[in-house]
């Protein structure tokens, strides 16, 4: 059993690992993730670790999972809402074929430009179309245009949790039948099962109800099949079936 010091340390990284043992999570990273992590992803991960908001990044094990997923479904046309420094975008770009594409949207280009030199050095910048600004107006325009319906193989959402349901209402039309939408942080630091009086960080408490609402809505949506996994901070995969 972990001692109090270990528990304390784990709480600081708990947003990205739901495992109760730091040692077990470190074992996964040291044995299966870091030895196989491509050099560009390692470089960007280490750069991002120095950012004051580094907790916003995709964890290395989740990056590995996304890369495997992209390859398994033979994705070619993808979208990402919420980019930060681009670690998950880089993982996706490395897994896509040379003519694969990512429409990457985030409200802060400055953060993306931290990772852009790494992406460019890896020869992958041509796969990523970055749009700065809120994603909802872009999605609305795409739906209005009509030509984007059912055009995406994979969509990854790691952005403002209070808009996840608004994203879902639109993305379900843009992903193809048989395609996947991945919603990140759906276990939200484990707070989805925390009692009402639990001592939670302010931002965790604020977004918890939105995450709970999303999870309930996805479970009841007949247009998708779902699988919720305790990878990183929880990811729910939604496969469009109608």
Curated annotation (Swiss-Prot):
Organism in which the protein naturally occurs: Petunia hybrida
Induction statement: Circadian-regulation with peak levels occurring in the afternoon in flowers.
Catalysed conversion reaction: (E)-caffeoyl-CoA + S-adenosyl-L-methionine = (E)-feruloyl-CoA + S-adenosyl-L-homocysteine + H(+); (E)-5-hydroxyferuloyl-CoA + S-adenosyl-L-methionine = (E)-sinapoyl-CoA + S-adenosyl-L-homocysteine + H(+)
Keyword Metal-binding appears in the UniProt entry: yes
GO molecular function terms listed in the Swiss-Prot or TrEMBL record: caffeoyl-CoA O-methyltransferase activity; metal ion binding
Primary subcellular site in the record, as a coarse category: cytoplasm
InterPro entries per record: Cation-dep_OMT (IPR050362), SAM-dependent_MTases_sf (IPR029063), SAM_O-MeTrfase (IPR002935)
Record protein name field: Caffeoyl-CoA O-methyltransferase 2
Cofactor note: Binds 1 divalent metal cation per subunit.
Gene Ontology cellular-component terms listed: cytosol
Keyword Methyltransferase: yes
Domain of life: Eukaryota
Sequence similarity: Belongs to the class I-like SAM-binding methyltransferase superfamily. Cation-dependent O-methyltransferase family. CCoAMT subfamily.
Keywords for the protein's UniProt record, in alphabetical order: Cytoplasm, Lignin biosynthesis, Metal-binding, Methyltransferase, S-adenosyl-L-methionine, Transferase
């Amino acid at each position: 059993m972990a001692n109090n010091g270990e528990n304390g340390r784990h709480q600081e990284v708990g947003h990205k690992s739901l495992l109760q043992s730091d040692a077990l999570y470190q074992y996964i990273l040291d044995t299966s993730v870091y030895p196989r992590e491509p050099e560009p992803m390692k470089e960007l991960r280490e750069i991002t670790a120095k950012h004051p908001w580094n907790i916003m990044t995709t964890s290395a094990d989740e990056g590995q999972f996304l890369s495997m997923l992209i390859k398994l479904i033979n994705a070619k046309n993808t979208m990402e809402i919420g980019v930060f420094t681009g670690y998950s975008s880089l993982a996706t770009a490395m897994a896509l074929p040379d003519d694969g594409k990512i429409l990457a949207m985030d409200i802060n280009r400055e953060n993306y430009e931290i990772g852009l030199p790494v992406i460019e050095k890896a020869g992958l910048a041509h796969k990523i179309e970055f749009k700065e600004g809120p994603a909802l107006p872009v999605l609305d325009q795409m739906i209005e245009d009509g030509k984007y319906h059912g055009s995406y193989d994979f969509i990854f959402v790691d952005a403002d949790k209070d808009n996840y349901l608004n994203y879902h209402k639109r993305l379900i039309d843009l992903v193809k039948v048989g395609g996947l939408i991945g919603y990140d942080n759906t276990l939200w630091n484990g707070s989805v099962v925390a009692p009402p009086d639990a001592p939670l960080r302010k931002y965790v408490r604020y977004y918890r109800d939105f995450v709970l609402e999303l999870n309930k809505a996805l479970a009841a949506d007949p247009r998708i099949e779902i699988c919720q996994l305790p990878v990183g901070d929880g990811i729910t995969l939604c496969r469009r079936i109608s």
